[in-house]
Amino acid sequence: MVRRSLYFLAVMGVVRSSSGLYIPSVVLQELGIASSQGCLMIAETNNGNFGIVSSGLENPVYITESPQGHREVSWQPVRGEDRAVPIYAPSAEEVRESISSVRGSEPGQYIAPQPTGFVPASTPVFGTIESASTAGAAVPVEGVFVASTENPASTGSSSTSTCPPKGTAGTTDNKGKAGGAAADDKSKSSSSSSSKKKKKGAKSLVALGAVATTALFSIVM
């Protein structure tokens, strides 16, 4: 089976001891010119240079798999004594095995990026929650908390209470509730009045800006 493709561009590169492997623009231009002339290959000429040549439709290049199961390929040269390497697209397994490790000393398998290293912000995180014991000392209690600013969840019945202590008499407790409600009403009324004042001030600024713009246009005209 002949596998001809332009994906395996590394075969068309030029190897130099100083600069390594690269693909010059001349090679790409020759590839575009010869692509309509049958099977393409890299051929070594008599002077030792490599170039893109076309084998022609009458002399195709055959690529056969090794009977031992190896992924190495063999080909039939079509340029006499010149050596020719056919251009073909490697399989996914060949690409994986050709990629070396980070150090470059041992061959490694290609591993696609995995989403396991990314943790969303809403994912519960296991940690230690400190709770107050009966003696007043902080005792670590295992629990679950969510890294969020809204509605933090906590578990355990021995969590520290933030409510004010209850009074000894029922009248005192009722007075405290009434005082708290009155304070809440006052704070709500003050916040609403301040927001109304801010809105009125913004409207007056907008009106003043409109008047100034109209006056400026009338002066210019």
From Swiss-Prot:
Topology within the bilayer: Lipid-anchor; GPI-anchor
One GO CC term on file: cytoplasm
Subcellular location, principal: other
Chain residues carrying a lipid of type GPI-anchor amidated serine: S192
Bias (Low complexity) ranges: 154-173
Propeptide stretches in the record: 193-221
Entry keyword Membrane: yes
Annotated keywords: Cytoplasm, Glycoprotein, GPI-anchor, Lipoprotein, Membrane, Signal
Top-rank taxon, per record: Eukaryota
Chain spans, region Disordered: 150-203
Bilayer-crossing regions: none
Localization, UniProt: Spore wall; Membrane; Cytoplasm
Signal peptide feature range: 1-20
Function comment: Spore wall component.
Name used for this protein in its record: Spore wall protein 3
Naturally occurring in which organism (per UniProt): Encephalitozoon cuniculi (strain GB-M1) (Microsporidian parasite)
Lineage of source species: Eukaryota, Fungi, Fungi incertae sedis, Microsporidia, Unikaryonidae
